[in-house]
Structures are given as structure tokens and as C-alpha cells.
Amino acid sequence: MKFDTVIMGGGLAGLLCGLQLQQHGLRCAIVTRGQSALHFSSGSLDLLSALPDGQPVTDITAGLDALRRQAPEHPYSRLGAQKVLTLAQQAQTLLNASGAQLYGDVQQAHQRVTPLGTLRSTWLSSPEVPVWPLSAQRICVVGVSGLLDFQAHLAAASLRQRDLNVETAEIDLPELDVLRDNPTEFRAVNIARLLDNEEKWPLLYDALSPIATNCDMIIMPACFGLANDTLWRWLNERLPCALTLLPTLPPSVLGIRLHNQLQRQFVRQGGIWMPGDEVKKVTCRHGIVSEIWTRNHADIPLRPRFAVLASGSFFSSGLVAEREGIREPILGLDVQQTATRAEWYQQHFFDPQPWQQFGVVTDDAFRPSLAGNTVENLYAIGSVLAGFDPIAEGCGGGVCAVSALQAAHHIAERAGEQQ
């Protein structure tokens, strides 16, 4: 099977890369093993929240300039501030075209409210998520009886520290009792599958209406809206106060929805989606990827003109930690890591951890190296890249988006030259 590009990994980076390549008229396939990290995320995307020295970033342009001085090997630093902003804006356009109408500005970060009621700087958020400063003074944080993925009293306690009048309440929906037989089934995603049925909408409205008459804003867990935000908009039109949603513990409704919207758009545009499959071997001859072998296709290789590695970091097994060191398991690419295992981590858990910055070694075009030699038609994107800390620097989603589009543009340019 021949393709212009085969992408190994179906997370945020892989999907955005595929969508951008389709814009250039290239035929793409994505091989994905299972759920991506988006299923376990808040559904919001960070661009750059803090510098390596811990200084918070609000002006993105100034932050990118400072980042280049502090971390010259960061993926953003390799591209330059203006290029990062341009690619980020293009990524936002792609997301919106896929149905993910996310709120945000590449030039200026905003503060979203977290499930614990604290604030986190971010780039893009779903319109349901409350953004600071809140537009209300009288707030009620509403939990769902029996739902352990969200603790209303914890969020309320944090918000009260910001001089807000915050109460808590709990709604009990007997229609959800079918899920209560097994506590592991009473999760936000399973609740959403029931509540997203249009016949159940009035039940949720009836439960929230008495609370809405006594406050200016309801904050509740995101336990509906797996496919879209239609129910949220329907409730907002009818309730006498604003309704906002907070992400829950994973799996996350908002994260799953974002992934599904991108995946459906990729397939609609003619992309080949290979779920439940796994790349077992890549044939690389003279610095060129020629064949990709997967578990499900056995002796039938995929033959791409270009290949993209979007396999993620440790969480997605894109990187594997062993006693002897860190390795990239598919091709055995060169990995940037510390000299000894003792340097992988810091003693204090909440300090920036060195292992977060481990990843494959690439050139400025994000082409990785194998035994010191660049693989000419292979690109590495997203969390598998080295040189950045997605947690401490708050840049995980941004690096995925920016590197994906940079690789896609580079591939499209080279593909045009080869025709």
C-alpha cells in the first residue's frame, strides 16, 4: 500500500499533521494503537505558560524571545518566535474547521479555572470552561451524586479565596442509577453517554433549575457533551444563570471530544485511519524510510514517500525507560538523555524533572537521527521531541501543534519538488 505520508501515532500531533497534509493534497494514513493522551487531558491546550527559570508568561511573543535565550534547544527556539505564532494560528484555524470551536489568542494567554478551583494559564480552551475573571459574583459549584471524578467542595474552597460568594450543591439523577451498580462505571464519560441522549436533556434542566434561580453562575463537572456542545448551549439558553463546565479526572469528556472531532475530520477528508494497529518494524535503507510494517497488515508493508513519528512520550510508549537508558522503540533513533540514571529526576516531586525533556534528537526541520545520521524522509513531532518540559513550561499542546504543522509544510514542499 502506497501513501504520500504515513503517520505513526494518532494523537494531537499526528492528527494535526495529517489534516495539514490533506490541505496540500497529499494522501495520508495514520497508524494508531489505541487511545491518545488527549483522552486523559483537560481538553485545553497550552502554548507557553512559564519559562525554564519559572517566570510566568503572559505576553507570548516576549516569552518566546526569552525562551530562546534560556533554552536554545527548545522546539520553539529552533523555529523562532514569529514562526511559532504563525503556525499556532494555523493550528487554531485547523481545529476550528474540525468543529472544535476553542477560545483563545496566540498573542495573549488566558487563565482558565481548573477542577480544583485554581487558575492555570493556557492558550486554547473549550467555550464551556470558565475563564478568569469570572463574569459572576454569586457562584454555585454543583456536583453529581456518586460521581467521584469531581469534588465540588474543593473547587469551591479555592474560589472563595478569591473574594467570591461560592456555595456548593449536589444533584441526584435517578436515571443514572443504571451506572451505580459498579462504581468503576460511574464515570464522567459513561454519564455523558446517557445524558447526551436528547430525551434526557429535560431531566438535567429540571435538576439544575432550582439551583440556577439563586446564583449567577453554575460550575459543574463536564459530564456531558461527548460529541459536541449542543446540550451545553441548550441549557445556557434556558437556565436563568450562566452554566460552565470543569474537566474531571481522566478519562475526560472534553479531551475525548477534541480527539474525536479531529479524527472524524481526518477521515471525512479522505485520510486512512488504522485504529488498533501498531508499527512493529520500519525498514530504513541508506537514510530513507522505505517500508513500515504493522501488526495487523503482517506481510503487507506500507510504502510511504515520507513518514512521521508522532508516537508520544513515555505515557504513550513513544519512549521506553530501561536500566541501561532511554530508547525509542520503533526505529532505535538517537535519544537525548542524561549520562547517568541518577540524573533522570530531582528529589522533590514538584520540581521540574529532567526526564520530561528527554526525546529523540532532530535537526531544525525535526528530522531525527539514527546512529548519528539524519533520516531524510522521516519527521518526529509532538511529545517524542527532546528539549522541552510540557508540564513545568506549560507548552505540551503548543509543541504538538507547532511541530506537526512545521513538518507538514516541509513535507508538502519536498513532495511538490519531487513531482
Swiss-Prot record:
Gene Ontology CC, one term: glycerol-3-phosphate dehydrogenase (FAD) complex
GO process annotations (BP): glycerol catabolic process
Disulfide bond entries: none
Pathway: Polyol metabolism; glycerol degradation via glycerol kinase pathway; glycerone phosphate from sn-glycerol 3-phosphate (anaerobic route): step 1/1
Gene3D superfamilies named in the record: FAD/NAD(P)-binding domain (3.50.50.60)
InterPro entries reported in the protein's UniProt record: FAD-dep_OxRdtase_2_FAD-bd, FAD/NAD-bd_sf, G3P_DH_GlpB_su
Domain of life: Bacteria
Cofactor: FMN
Function (record text): Conversion of glycerol 3-phosphate to dihydroxyacetone. Uses fumarate or nitrate as electron acceptor.
Descriptive protein name: Anaerobic glycerol-3-phosphate dehydrogenase subunit B
